[in-house]
Amino acid sequence: MEYMVDRRGIPMDVLTRMKIEERLEFLPQTGKEEACICFPYLEDGVMKNMKFRDAAKHFKMVKGAELIPWNIDAIKGKEKCYITEGEIDALSLIAAGLEEVVSVPNGAGGANLQWLDRFVESHFDDKAEIILAMDTDKRGVELRDELVRRLGVDRCKVVAWGEGCKDANEYLLKYDLPRLRQQVEQAAEIPLE
């Protein structure tokens, strides 16, 4: 957990509360067991999947498990929610006091948003405001644009990370938790065309 606290700026109490752990896991990318951060994917408090990530950014999820947004229980019945491109960005927002946050299950790699179909009615249709806190790279922008299209331009806002930051965690590391929260709360409406 040293990596998450020291190199990613996520407080240990947040990691504990969110049930983030570290353990050895076999990763096909390296062909051996690696020390991995484990992100539990829960729905109604029940484990549905687990994502494993090593320090070299190799990822693995449980084979055959359902893809669901990470931290999906946190947004049910809320007026507003935040969507990030990854769990570490979501943890950064949680550390800044923004609890109603989910991460897409598979990053921006590919525009596979099939998981969204199952959750639109139960978790997103009731939202007055959806804040999209995606990465600023090409894939992040494509993901953001597709989420806006699917969730509605009239209720989506977009976070701008500014010069030198591509995502929420980089912003946290460059500045601090209060500034991260302020930046996210200044998300801009999307102009209607």
Pin down the residues of each PLM region.
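Conserved beta-strand -> loop -> alpha-helix junction used to position metal-binding or nucleic-acid-contacting
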Residues: 156-170
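Short, small/acidic-rich helices and loops at N termini and domain boundaries
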Residues: 2, 6-35, 83, 166-193
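Short, acidic/turn-prone active-site loops that include or flank metal/cofactor-
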Residues: 104-110, 136, 161-164
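Acidic beta-strand-to-loop metal/phosphate-binding motif
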Residues: 83, 125-139
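Phosphate-handling DNA/RNA-contact segment within nucleic-acid enzymes
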Residues: 25-126, 144
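Short hydrophobic alpha-helical runs that function as membrane-insertion/retention elements
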Residues: 100-103, 131, 157-158
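Short, aromatic/basic amphipathic alpha-helical patches
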Residues: 142-153
